[in-house]
Amino acid sequence: MKTKMPTLSEATRVVYKRRKNGTKSATNFLIGMKHNIKALGDLPVNKITRPMVNKMMDTLKQEHKNSNAVVNQKMGYLRVVLQEMEEDGYIEMIKMPKPRPTKNTKVHYLTKQMEDKLLNYLLDKEDTLHQELVRLIDQNPNTNYSLWNNRWETYAECYAIIACLIDLGCRVNELLNLEKRFVDFDNNQINFNDRKNDQAVAVPMTKRVRGFMYNYSCYKDDFDKLFTLNYSQLNTIWQKARKDLGYADKKFYTIHLCRHTCASRLVQRGVPILLVKDWLGHEDIENTMIYAHLAPKALHSVVEVLN
């Protein structure tokens, strides 16, 4: 072991510089560790014990009024710092306390019927606008109908984006910011390098996704985004569809529902939860565990006893 032992605040700065500086999670990490240090004290890292961490979690819960989910997240930040110190040869990693129990989160997702209903709605809108455009051009070929053409293309692109979100399970902005160079047709995968947890992941393409990727990558340069819609434009169409399809009173019916749909289907079809975690790009398995109850045959063996 090394002799000069860093304090927890010094170790936090080391991790920030090495792993967090410039990342999307940097601010949350620093705030979380500030609360941890206040609860634990700015001790040398080799003086931190499991009972101390348990007490820290109690303090975060009682004095900071943090939910169990937030307490678990802050414990995760502490774990990262201590693991870094272990790699640097300062300490032997302590056994961390078990995460605090969190409420079971109700998972909403699109059924196949709901998916078809949504995509058919977008397809019908696209088709109606296209037919109207053709009719107007037939009436007067010399008139500029770029506005109609843009509206038609917008619904066509929205259809492609929603279908890809359902199959890929990525976050909306990960897809909207996707550049052509990150679509690997040779290996049939998309390389997401701008994920929320700053960890790159390669996600295989379904046949449907591959078709859309091919269509929208044609005539694009390597650094061009595949899609032209921004989040606001996409959400405007989604909210109109939500209202027209009769889901206006369903708060869960947001674009993020596509991600839940992909995750739910993977679990329902027997994909191991750790693979689902990697597919979604979750940093913590706890985030993926909200889908675990959807696994097939979880209770099927019990019914055999009743039979």
Q: Where on the chain are the PLM-derived regions?
A:
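N-terminal core-binding DNA-recognition domain of tyrosine site-specific recombinases/integrases
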Residues: 4-6, 13-83, 90, 104-108, ...
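C-terminal flanking helix
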Residues: 79-82, 86, 295-299
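C-terminal catalytic core of tyrosine-transesterase DNA break-rejoin enzymes
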Residues: 87, 160-163, 167, 174, ...
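Conserved tyrosine-mediated DNA breakage-rejoining catalytic core shared by Y-recombinases
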Residues: 168-173, 177-213
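Short, basic (Lys/Arg/His-rich) helix/loop patches that form interaction surfaces
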Residues: 144-152, 203, 217-225, 235-278
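Major-groove DNA-contacting interfaces characterized by cationic-aromatic clusters
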Residues: 46, 129-153, 186-193, 210-240
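Basic, Lys/Arg- and aromatic-enriched nucleic-acid-binding interface segment
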Residues: 72, 91, 97-172, 176, ...
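Catalytic-site neighborhood detector that most strongly recognizes the C-terminal catalytic loop/helix
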Residues: 109, 194-198, 280, 284-305
